[in-house]
């Protein structure tokens, strides 16, 4: 027999960085622990420069004092349902499940957002938004997180996020940019200038270490990610970001 509990670390309660504690607890109690029900909801195209942290805190944005951070006891109720947060949550969960040799397995139970009579209070009433694609089959950013871990046949690179083309912030404040890929290394360029090569390591977070702090210029910015495959071929992804 296989045991698969519901563990909603970082959604209905707690923080997603407490996931390992829950996993360790059930591994001791059950020899065949498979986890299939976890995650959270997100709106396609909703983004924030400051997603709730892995510790379950609303974080400051450089110009605020860190002391004003506040805890979020139930992110499902008071969170912003941004794609950024759910990407981080899934990334953390997969990082643990893929690297824990005592973990029997993992599956994603909701591939697509779906209608339900049980969710009249949701931002989109009667729709459960825990899927990796929306009702029109448009992939959310979380789709590419899973693809980076579970697809080893089709090389790809995806700059987070193609639905986040307008960003803002104080001049000189670097912004985080992640690239999700199943290739071994990525080089990221900003307006044709290399920001360095990083190697993928699933023990690293976020994006298996494929993360850069980018100093956007005012106006249009062109981000280019170039991945190298095992065969030496190059895979490219490009994104235009308007920064103000």
Identify the residue ranges that each predicted region occupies.
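Extended substrate-binding grooves/exosites of carbohydrate-active enzymes
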Residues: 1-202, 209-218, 222, 226-231
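A short, sequence-level motif marking secondary-structure junctions
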Residues: 201-203, 242-243
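Edge beta-strands of extracellular beta-sandwich domains
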Residues: 232-243
